Amino acid sequence: MITLNTNYDELYRQIKNIEDRFLDCNSLNSAAVYYATYQSLVDFYFRATLQNPCNKKVNHNKFVKYSGIQRLNTLSKKRINHFIESRKKHLSYISSVFFEFSDILNEFIDSDYYEYLYSKGMPNISVDEGFNILYSFFDECCPKVGELFDKFLEEDKFFMLPEVSLYSNRDGCTIYNSVDNVCDVFLKPNVRSLELLSLVIHELSHVEDMQSYASQSSSINTSLYQMRSPFCEVPAFYNQFRFYEYLLKNDIYKDAAIADWVNNLVMSIESMDNLLLFSMYPSKKLQKQSVCIPKCDVLNAILEERAEDIPIEFDSTDIIDENISLDDSVQYSYGPLFAMTMMDDEQLYNKFLMIRDGYFDSDKLSYIGLSSDEVQQKVIKKSQDFFGKY
């Protein structure tokens, strides 16, 4: 449906431009952002072409490399320490909705209808029909994303996602290049038709979010927003979920829309489950490692430290042996959760956009109408209405 660009010369151009601009780094934050952006683009380019694009002399710029790494480590520690300080609030916030939400979802997954959806599979959608569906949705719900879609098609800026371990479980990703103030969108090949449409909306919504943020702040701060905010996935899921609802209201591939939406909600439940575990994980262990931790190790560490507080016996052999990360658990919990909460309330969403930067702050969330009680009520009502119909 969308021809993915496998010519990565544009990435090479961006890499060279960042190398030329290394001397512009005049602060620790700029060094961190330049280094992180540079390493991401280099990694993608190398995975895609098996060629190292780095200028060795430039790559050894000590200020950018060492100050950038040092600052990134500092930002990471701040993010982890803030999570540890507010872990009880995360635990209370997520648990207020998690159990009832997961019960509703699991009941639907156990139904005959979901079994029918699963066995039916995804429909084949022609290129023309797919484009018509997208443009109709853009016109009605998010015209700015539609303009981005036209631009990315015209400039051939939908790149094929190479095999990068960091993104191995994702169908797409968006990298914000603060130096050129541009976004690069990567999509996996062979994504099924309706899933591809929703994926395009998700990733281009990231682009719109970055552009909107950059219009009100510096490019460096825009990158920092993407690095540290627990809410950077909310705008993407907000538009993606509205797309599913648009399909349902207009009776467009209803079964496929429900199946794809449910798959995203299952991912959200898994992320919330991981976030609840991290909120009980020993602080010292989390400070040492917050990325790619075996889930079994997290559970066992919790059981060792809090055995007397947990009356239920757990068998770690029942846990799928997968690696989990704190940042992903946070972002992919609040992203779908807040999208579900606000998708019928544009005024609330606009208020949320004003506070989406920075760290988790339950007082700010409550002030605009996103207290844990309000989120719980809206998500459960939305879930019951949705699953009650289908």
Task: Cite the ranges covered by each PLM segment.
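N-terminal helix-rich structural modules
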Residues: 1-93
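C-terminal, non-catalytic "cap/extension" segments appended to globular domains
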Residues: 73-88, 108-111, 293-390
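Short active-site segment of divalent metal-dependent hydrolases/proteases
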Residues: 201, 205-209
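Long, amphipathic alpha-helical stalk/connector segments used for oligomerization, subunit docking
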Residues: 245-324
